[in-house]
Amino acid sequence: DKICIGHQSTNSTETVDTLTETGVPVTHAKELLHTEHNGKLCATNLGNPLILDTCTIEGLIYGNPSCDMLLGGREWSYIVERPSAVNGTCYPGNVENLEELRILFSSSSSYQRVQMFPDTIWNVTYSGTSKSCSDSFYRNMRWLTQKNGNYPVQDAQYTNTRGKNILFVWGIHHPPTDTAQTNLYTRTDTTTSITTESLDRTFKPLIGPRPLVNGLIGRINYYWSVLKPGQTLRVRSNGNLIAPWFGHVLSGESHGRILKTDLNSGNCVVQCQTEKGGLNSTLPFHNISKYAFGNCPKYIGVKSLKLAIGLRNVPARSSRGLFGAIAGFIEGGWPGLVAGWYGFQHSNDQGVGMAADRDSTQKAVDKITSKVNNIVDKMNKQYEIIDHEFSEIENRLNMINNKVDDQIQDIWAYNAELLVLLENQKTLDEHDANVNNLYNKVKRALGSNAMEDGKGCFELYHKCDDQCMETIRNGTYNRRKYMEESRL
């Protein structure tokens, strides 16, 4: 009678890489890299995105009349700005610290417009318009001009009693000629001051023609600040002021992301959103976009990252494992061994049989499960690559930022790949060791009652029915019971 120790083989085509080998065939492997997305803009755990369509964020904040659909308060988890959006500041001019403004606004999760200065507070004309703004003007600012040939000093105050920060905006008009200046403001030498407990700004117009933009050779320079709870804003001007009218009460925290994309909105909720689409995944890594946000796997820029779960599938003599078990004296796997990774095959007078060794298999499975969790834990240090916005004059800063981001991502990708290579090496060697240990366990139990054949089997010196074979498998074999028969 005969009993053999062996391991499983399958028709799997899975391969993994280790520190010393590439493309090692294995019975089972787990892909750790998520590679698919739904191609849509989805809600996240923080809520729905705010999709601006034809407007930019600054168009919303300053109140471009083409963005009237956004005048009501909104909430968002992230903001989507279309690449083709044209409705920003309609009257030509620059927004000071525009990138900071966009970050500040997008980091909140909601805004509510509140009136800061009623029209009755001004004793000049407050209904200035522009053809470049659809013969209208910004919904959050008033263009103050002379009334009946007079422009007395305007002096107004507003105290924030809302209990939350208020984002407010204003502008300074720079006419193209002295004539335009005096027609609007009666004098050429004007001064505007915008002050709070923490802000002190003074402005004078720079009169002169500029290149034609939107049919205009004048400019408005745009400004913004935040009025904290309890602070008072004081506005004093005798000309050229585009005065604050409505402010935005900013509340909450969002993902703080602005996606510039033409993706369609979907009826979906995802853990993780990117500019390419949303994804849900329980895997530790993804390769969709380095600008992913939400509850995301770690981004690494590789095509595949497979963790060995099972054994070597086609063991070869030349590829010996750490203990030599699988690749050595046990020549090939058993396709019929389906209930476990390791097991026994026997032949006796009752026929042949095969059985998995559930104990050693379960211990190996537990170890593999722990291994996957450990990889997740080791890579669980939070890092996010954010698509920061820089102005055109900050190209060097932008280049440095991108270089640092790329290096961080490269380091994480290297760490992940190295960790998986190490674990794959250990897994395959541990499988070798497990088969070897099972073999030695049987060898110790049988002692002199059997002879090794050098191929992973034992020729028994006594008759061994199925019940006897089961005692060898489960570790209850009584060597003394068969010792006398074995000597014959």
Question: Where are the regions that the model predicts?
Answer:
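Generic short alpha-helical hydrophobic face used as a protein-protein interaction/packing hotspot
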Residues: 59, 94, 270-272, 324
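Membrane-penetrating hydrophobic segments
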Residues: 303-333
